Amino acid sequence: MSMSSYPRQRPRRLRSTVAMRRLVAQTSLEPRHLVLPMFVADGIDEPRPITSMPGVVQHTRDSLRRAAAAAVAAGVGGLMLFGVPRDQDKDGVGSAGIDPDGILNVALRDLAKDLGEATVLMADTCLDEFTDHGHCGVLDDRGRVDNDATVARYVELAVAQAESGAHVVGPSGMMDGQVAAIRDGLDAAGYIDVVILAYAAKFASAFYGPFREAVSSSLSGDRRTYQQEPGNAAEALREIELDLDEGADIVMVKPAMGYLDVVAAAADVSPVPVAAYQVSGEYAMIRAAAANNWIDERAAVLESLTGIRRAGADIVLTYWAVDAAGWLT
């Protein structure tokens, strides 16, 4: 019997039908993998659209409660809350973030009351939204971010957020020693079960641009003395390993799409879950292309999220969390 000249190995066999492709899929994307970032602003009477992020708003307390309930009903895995205070409440040390009556802590209590343990309630643990200079920390007399003074404020922020009902605190300022200090502070205050999601590898990225509008940032200058250089993968792994040593329960890479190599490397070394943040600029980029009918928004979003999961992210923060949950179910 003569051998066929055609290939015996035909990978297309495993792509022949929808059912076959589903059976052999190597990467899953489910609503539970997704976390919805949400913004809540003080002093507004109705949701305020964020022009650079079409479809995303700064919520009032009431609209936040409705949107959060809808996200939970859609099956989204968690909610990450950012507070936007009034300009007159900002100061040099971010006091509004620690104030129990500050917008973020009040909103956390609202959602903790409404949702209980039906979702994972996360809080951004940083000062940039609350400072009049827009930096992620306390400035010294030369105008530089004072690492240790900032970490002390982060501990106060984290404890205030835990007291308000956060299940997860997310230190995002990239200060040295922040995870260990926050862990010690939470434990001393009795919040031993509150999870720390460490922004372990946060790069100084151009893709944060729309976020500055989202939180009404007062920043002038840049954050390159504490956020990482985009080309430094080995440094990112060092930061991840330091945060793991300090007790991080989850480590995150931010942004996501331009840093999938770092996500993959983090997944290789991390014994705890790895998260990745599909940031505002990534969202705006796809939305703009879709608005011009240059790409199919749904297909592009699901492909991008699948790529982040394929790289090794267990959790993906995305402004499409609710939309994607609907598309996936």
UniProtKB/Swiss-Prot annotation:
GO terms for cellular component: cytosol; peptidoglycan-based cell wall. Coiled coil: none annotated. Its EC number is 4.2.1.24. Keywords: Heme biosynthesis, Lyase, Magnesium, Metal-binding, Porphyrin biosynthesis. Mg(2+) binds at residue 239. Pathway: Porphyrin-containing compound metabolism; protoporphyrin-IX biosynthesis; coproporphyrinogen-III from 5-aminolevulinate: step 1/4. Gene3D superfamilies: Aldolase class I. Disulfide bonds: none annotated. The keyword Lyase applies. One of its GO terms (biological process) is protoporphyrinogen IX biosynthetic process. It holds the Pfam family ALAD. The keyword Metal-binding applies. It is an enzyme of class 4 (lyase). One of its GO terms (molecular function) is zinc ion binding. 5-aminolevulinate 1 binds at residues 212, 223. 5-aminolevulinate 2 binds at residues 280, 319. It catalyses: 2 5-aminolevulinate = porphobilinogen + 2 H2O + H(+). The active site is at 202 (schiff-base intermediate with substrate), 254 (schiff-base intermediate with substrate). InterPro entries: ALAD, ALAD_AS, Aldolase_TIM. Belongs to the ALAD family. Catalyzes an early step in the biosynthesis of tetrapyrroles. Binds two molecules of 5-aminolevulinate per subunit, each at a distinct site, and catalyzes their condensation to form porphobilinogen. NCBIfam families: PRK09283.1. Homooctamer. This is Delta-aminolevulinic acid dehydratase.
